[in-house]
Amino acid sequence: MTQWIAAIARGHNSGICLLKDGELVFSIEEERLSRKKYDGGPLASMIKILDYTDTLDYLVVAHTQPLDQAGSNDFTGEPIYVALARKLGLIDRKEDIYKHPQVIDYSHIHHKLHSSCAFFRSGFESAVSVIVDGAGTFIPMEIDREQEMTWELETIIKCEYPDKFKTLYKHQGGRGPWGAVRIEKFVSDREGEEGTHELILDDSAGIVKAYEAVTQYCGWAPIEAGKTMGLFPYGKENNEIPDIYTNYDGRSDWATTNRDIIVPTYPNGAVVNKGRFLEIREPMDTNGIKDLTKLDNRRDMAYAIQTESQSMVLDLIFKAVEMSGEKNVVLSGGYGLNCVANYWYLPQLKEKGINLFVEPVSNDAGTAIGAAYWHYQKTSKNMKVHPVMKDLYYGPKHEYDPEYITCLLYTSDAADE
């Protein structure tokens, strides 16, 4: 009997993934249908499911906060995505709409979904995943006898078939203020696992949040970090700019973002503390320059964040290999989109015999793919290794020959007589 699993990512970079008996047959980001960059709420994407199947076995949801915190349907009150699936007939209309057995919420394991996406498309039989993300799952914790919110920043997970994922390391951050702590053996109950993992908990920005801060400093929205990556070659090393990441000259046993220069604003973005340091303040006279990227301090900050952050991630990869004993590494989370860094790692990893697979859909749209595979592996326990992905084209194939285009032009009165 055929099994259909659809998974949606419902935040920014929202999208959908559809599996048929464990094979990916369709995946798309909402922005491709709505033409709104980074669009959230994959409603148009869900409607496209009907091009492939009339019913689903499971609708799986990926995000960083529980599904019951999503928008609700008028009158009935169930989450809007459950309502749409019900109205389209994709899930059983007779079941409890508030606790629908076909709707599975995986919002509590955001980084595992990034890992699942990368691992199950890598072709590796086993690997260690390195997730470097802006802010993953919201994790409430009691800190200094107060209830505080923390967020996943960087995570290392050992991955094996069929669905054996073991968290080895996690860095969680928050607004604070609170004292930083490193716990070598933190109980992994929240991860749904036995045993322990290493936990770093502090009130600094993570690797990606620091990159977002510099992106804002350069005049863009935090999510436009790719533009900062493009600006970096125009900058240079500038010793007047303080280190963005630091282990305080070896006085700490881990490196983290320097809060003197980067102030996190979880869950969205961070800011450069530009008033604190002379070199990165606004010039008194900008000579009429409105484009901030023309300023040397912006270009030099782009250079600093690119070179320092990629070194941080390389160190994290080496840590992952050491902790797991694996030579196969999969990389995902937002920083996986940094193609400059991805090529920079390669010769250094090759020297140590480390194989690297970088997930192309490392943004949150990839968590829909990861959620679909995760649920398939959980329910099937299939030990067959998924083949390594060959391309990014999942969906309808459009073939337009010159004759068709010519005919279309004439029938629409667009041709030049």
Please annotate each region the language model reported:
Residues 107-130, 136-145, 347, 372-374:
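Conserved phosphate-binding catalytic cores of ATP/NTP-utilizing and phosphoryl-transfer enzymes
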Residues 48-103, 108, 116-121, 142:
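Short beta-strand-loop/turn "lid" adjacent to the catalytic site in phosphate-handling enzymes
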Residues 410-417:
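Conserved small/polar residues in nucleotide/adenosyl-binding loops
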Residues 216-327, 340-348, 382-383, 398-405:
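A contiguous, well-structured pocket-lining segment that forms one wall/lid of small-molecule binding clefts
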Residues 318-392:
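Catalytic phosphate/nucleotide-handling subdomain of diverse soluble enzymes
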Residues 39-43, 158-234, 368, 372-377:
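Glycine-rich phosphate-binding loop plus the immediately following alpha-helix
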Residues 11-39, 164-168:
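Short glycine-rich, Thr/Ser-proximal phosphate-binding strand/loop in the N-terminal lobe
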Residues 3-19, 130, 138-142, 155-158:
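Gly/Thr-rich phosphate-binding beta-strand-loop-beta motif of the actin/hexokinase/Hsp70
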